[in-house]
Regions:
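Conserved class I S-adenosyl-L-methionine
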Residues: 1-57, 70, 156-186
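Core SAM-dependent methyltransferase catalytic element
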Residues: 206-208, 229-255
């Protein structure tokens, strides 16, 4: 277990300085998030957050596996007291530097999302995990037990990630995709491709009560680059993968 975590940490320390992550930290990109914070979220997810939170001002929010920190910056702009955490110290250093440069008052903490060990019980009103987190988690029940632990009574957990229905397919756009694995094969080649029931059961076991689930096919948000911006990407007759939801969002509350 410790070896697995150390491997992930080493990979992310290197990846934090990759060309792709640098592209997520340009002044233009950061300015767009600060000026339009809702753009850091899929539109339906932001609507769910607004509805379920009833506003963000003064709310204590944890963003584990914060990565590029866009969601964390956005929530801070909206008035939340935000803590961003990540297993990568480099990611947190980059996040802190950008927040300081733009006058954002936020906390940045190095932490394993499965453990959330720096945080005490009942600290946060919201814990939000963004796209890509769950594929790095080898024990979702452990992650959600700790999310429930750090949430205040009545606090909300919201996850948004690639829909598990996408995982069995090769995923090429505009061609008939191949089936490359079984839906039940949750750990192919080191990735953790959890099923819908794995996510729901982990939340239920932790004592979280699911309030709402979204299954989204907002192709324009998922396929953000190049030819995939074309309107035809949303037509399943031309792009077969568009017949399936691209993302899933689940809101669950601590009783």
């Amino acid at each position: 277990m410790l070896e697995y975590i150390n491997e992930i940490k080493a990979w992310w320390e290197e990846t934090a300085d990759s060309e792709w992550y640098q592209s997520r930290r340009t002044e233009e990109m950061i300015r767009s998030v600060l000026e339009k914070p809702e753009s850091a979220f899929a539109p339906q997810v932001f609507g769910l957050l607004e509805k379920r939170m009833g506003g963000f001002a003064g709310k204590k929010v944890l963003v584990p596996s914060a990565g590029d920190c866009h969601a964390a910056y956005a929530l801070a702009v909206l008035g939340a007291e935000v803590t961003a955490s990540d297993i990568s110290i480099r990611q947190m250093m980059h996040g802190w530097r950008i927040a300081e440069a733009h006058g954002l008052e936020m906390d940045f903490v190095q932490a394993d999302t499965m453990q959330l060990e720096p945080f005490g019980g009942e600290e946060f009103d919201l814990v939000y995990t963004s796209n890509g987190v769950h594929s790095w988690i080898d024990k979702p029940e452990k992650m959600y037990a700790n999310i429930a632990r750090v949430l205040k009574s009545g606090g909300l957990s919201v996850m948004w990630d690639i829909h598990p229905f996408q995982r069995p397919f090769s995923g090429e756009r505009f061609v008939q995709p191949e089936i490359i694995k079984a839906y039940d094969d949750v750990s192919p080649q080191g990735d953790n491709h959890w099923r819908v029931m794995d996510l729901v059961n982990a939340m239920a076991k932790s004592g979280l009560c699911i309030e709402e689930m979204l299954e989204m096919s907002d192709i324009s948000y998922f396929y953000a680059f190049g030819e995939e911006k074309e309107a035809r990407a949303a037509d399943w007759r031309q792009n077969p993968m568009a017949a399936l939801p691209t993302h899933i969002c689940i809101a669950a509350r601590k009783g």
